[in-house]
Swiss-Prot record:
The protein's Enzyme Commission number: 2.4.1.141
Active site, UniProt feature: D233, C236, H339
Name this polypeptide is given: UDP-N-acetylglucosamine transferase subunit ALG13
Disordered: region residues: 393-438, 921-966, 998-1056
Pfam family, one: OTU
Superkingdom, taxonomy of origin: Eukaryota
Keywords: Endoplasmic reticulum, Glycosyltransferase, Hydrolase, Membrane, Multifunctional enzyme, Protease, Thiol protease, Transferase, Ubl conjugation pathway
Biased composition annotated in UniProt, kind: Pro residues: 921-930, 941-957, 1004-1034
Species assigned in the record: Mus musculus
Family: Belongs to the glycosyltransferase 28 family.
TM region(s), chain numbering: none
Amino acid sequence: MKRAFVTVGTTSFDELVARVVANDCVQILESLGYNHLVLQVGRGTVVPKPFRTESFTLDVYRYKDSLKEDLQQADLVISHAGAGSCLESLEKGKPLVVVVNEKLMNNHQFELAKQLHKEGHLFYCTCRVLSCPAPVSLLLVLLGSAKILQQLPSATLSCFGYLPTQAPVLVATAYSYLHSVFSSFPPLSTFLIIPCTMQKGWKKYCGQKSLNEASMDEYLGSLGLFRKVVAKDASCLFRAISEQLFHSQIHHLQIRRACVSYMKENQQAFESYVEGSFEKYLERLGDPKESAGQLELKALSLIYNRDFIIYRYPGKPPTQVTDNGFEDKIILCYSNNGHYDSVYSKEFQSTAGICQAILYELLYKDVFVVDEETLKTAVDLFRSGSRRNKHHALTASVEGSSDQKSSTEDRTEEAAACSSAASTPEGNKQGTERQKVPESPSKMLFPYKVLKALDPEIYRNVEFDAWLDSRKELQKSECVEYGGRYYFLGDKCQVCMESGGKYYNAHIQEIDNDKSSVVVFIEEFAERHSIPLAHVRPVNQVALLPSWNAIPIRNGRGYPTITGGYFPEIVMTDMNMKQRKKMFKKFRGKEIYMTMAYSRGDPLVPSRIQHSMHYGHDPLLYYSQTAGHILSSQHFYPQHSSQRQGRGYGMPRDSSHLISKQNLPNPKVGFCSGSGRKCCQSYDNVSYRSRSFRRSHRQMHCMNKGCQYGFAPENGVEETVTFYALEEGNETAYSTLPNNGGPTTMVPATSGYCVARQGYNSCKPPLNSGDSNDHCDNGGYHGDYLYSSEQGYETSSVYTTTVSTANLSLQDSGPSSVPQDTVTSYNYPQKVLENSAAIAVSWASHVPVPVIPNCAGDNEALRTSDISSQNAIQPGFVPPPAQGSPAYLEPSAAGAAGAAAAAAAAAAPVATPVAAPLPLPPPLPPPPPATLEAGDASGFPLPPPPPPPPPPPPPYSYDPSGSDLPQDTKVLQYYFNLGLQCYHHNYWHPMVYMPHVQQQLQPQPQPQPQPQPQPQPQPQPQPQQPQQQQPPPQQQQQQQEQVHGESYPDCTEQPLVDQSAPQVYSDVVREDGTQADVSTNDTFPIADAVPLPHGAVYYPVMTDPYGSPLLGFDSYVPVASDYSSIAMWHPVNAACGASAQIHGAMNPGPIGYMLLPNSPHYTPQN
């Protein structure tokens, strides 16, 4: 009775136990003569039930005090890879098969089993079924090997242990018995030729094939077939047919041409299977790079009188593609990727291996005149020294037998085999897998592939090897070197058609054989061209080019320094978003956008050409030199590139990588390439992550002159705006570009200015007397910024609105004054403010406002502190000089925002003059009343604008169906919410809602002198001349017709409210000075009628009484709107005046429509 003992020690190895007690395994044990099986299951959960039959007995237990008795009685030991079990079995001299538990990690079982196997003491494997060409369980391999070892002589078995000199004898003896033992098992015959390399040899082989291919090889091997791999290209079908017809694959092109010709001659039989043009299909089929399919198989079957049988799926019978009744068959294997391989029988493989060996022997003996003994010795050395590779080739896989190493590796391996034969005793040669490479390769005889072909037991796939070699050469040719640079297929590059010509973006598609030129696809032309390598250059991602005006940079704070910053337009245009993001560098904890100019001194662009350059998003930004020493020039380009206008690259479209104080993205400002676009972008509430950049910067938002929603083309010139971020101390070291003359005024900063100009000019006038070469394109506007500077213009009244975190400096020329901490100065000219509208003033708390001189000493500025964002905002009415109350601010001659305030009002700003005012200019004619809609309500004399023809009025919405409304829903949402917000502000003064009572029916009273001294940086008109500022009725009528396109009759309604006196929310002042109680129904009583001063009504946009939207919600409710004023339209016609009632108003009568004739165009945030 033969006994097999299976042990797992103290571990748990349920998979091994389950495999051993399986029915198929028990039957194999019985067929091999084993009739008693003992299982030691250890801690496992799988515990089979013992049973006893007449032919087989199964005993099961978990632990014993000692395994010596079972090991002594066992004829075969199957054990886990534990060191104790292996040593005990080897000490007993028992045949041992070790099964490695792959679920155990880092226990060195595999290394131990591999080393003992390498020394010839045991066999090892795993429980999983390998992807091998034979569908057998690994347990069959184990049991078969055990029977082989049982048949070995006892003297040989006694060699088990640690005798390395006798171990190879055991391996050789076991190998000699494998064929005889498994001759009755055809599926195992090829798989178990060399069981010692079962793990190591198959690992590489299995890694080269896909799961489908391995399963197909296993299935074909069970049928006595093998798959010969064909070159994996579009001609695989024709190669396989050529080989089966002519025993060679070199005729695949002739077979392809024959197929095309036959299908062309018999078009009626194949045309119905083709979609589209049949001629085009045949034309494509004639290309060797086009694959073939079932239609071509049908034609080839008729051409060569053979039917095709194709194996498609493992485990399923083949498919007979053609059934033409031919006796000869062509068997193919089809993969899911459309690849065809040849299928042969194993007998053909054996015969082909012998024929191949004879052919190569004749070749080397008769052609290369190699001694026969030399060939024989080389083959013997190959068989003994490269047994792993020999087994690799005998496993019926042509892929595995096709060596893919370079010739150097082949020669090295062959040299190792020769060295092994020369230095190793005869008894050790057969068990040596690989020896060290000798120092001298002079003993190398033949390449490894040649030795495989000389071995009659190996069938080498020569065709596949040749195709692989050609692919290697092709891969080597996919790279070309020129001028120290390497160019690969698919690389992007820039090429020029002729020497010194323009470079175009392209990518390499082919490399010529001579390696002197490449075939590229030029994107701009959408054409292929052969370009010499001398005209090819690589594409640089982002290049820092030297700036035009280098500024000395001193080291400080240890930050890195970049000494260049001008990025041409073509470089920025070609960069994608990912490359642009790379420009947003991080330096020691702060994020700096590379296109900003960080400098203490003058701009990088010379002042002599600054007026002739066309800027992008924002102007040059100058920060203190200690803020990182990053020197970079703003993107600029000439004015003639009108098609690129408005697409500057100073800042990205998405300013989300600028983090606000609330960690929210900065509001986006869209940009348009139209010639009428006016853009001005800075940074609103942006705090840089740096000690040097902890200042907040305000933003002057985008204004679109070409918008059709309440805008009119304007007249004037523009220049850049200079932003400053200041360090503490050193208040006079930072200066802007010098301008020419004019006073300097500082007003409280706003979150956005709505400054408009009237008139239209077909071409921009020169920016100054020295720059007269400016021109315009198509009569449009070139400047991208709202504010410009020019000598000889005065400021109008400018007031603050909403909230601010910085101060604004209205500078005309010369070096600017440098404010203190948390002050940001804005440099823009006064001409833009010509005919501009006064802006409503915030009624927040103010501190005394000093005036400090600038660096040059010839300008004066008015300093204000930050305006609190927590206080309520009241409407402000800006009349001409009239008798008023301290509750309102009176505009000064200089247009300062904190010009007048009551001494009793704690929130009123107080101005302290520091320098004497300039002399007053002579009186000038008043501006036309149409400027009221453009934003000018000051009434002070200003220089008359040139007399250009009035522009056509912007279109209004007249269609009741709303078809002429803007299509952008976000724009509609914004203005709807704006009107709704005004509706809910029912606690405002009724003058806000009734523009028709603003008509001046009586003379205006004189303004009261203010107790506080007023700064006088600008000329102030005489108080006794208020009537000169009002145009005659005929001129007013004409201006209304020009702006609105239609005239309205004068309003004869009596005024209802005293507009000259301030109205407090809680009180109503009558004409007699008494107060009227406020009604409890949320309305105000109507005051006595008094003469009304002439002027526009301006009110601030209040904060949303219903709360701000949630974070992340893209709402268009104008919460604390950045639009500084909303000019009122004065239609007095009954048909045009609205009859809507304002709930909660003092006099809910008819009101006029409101529109924004010159307010900034709302840009939706994407």
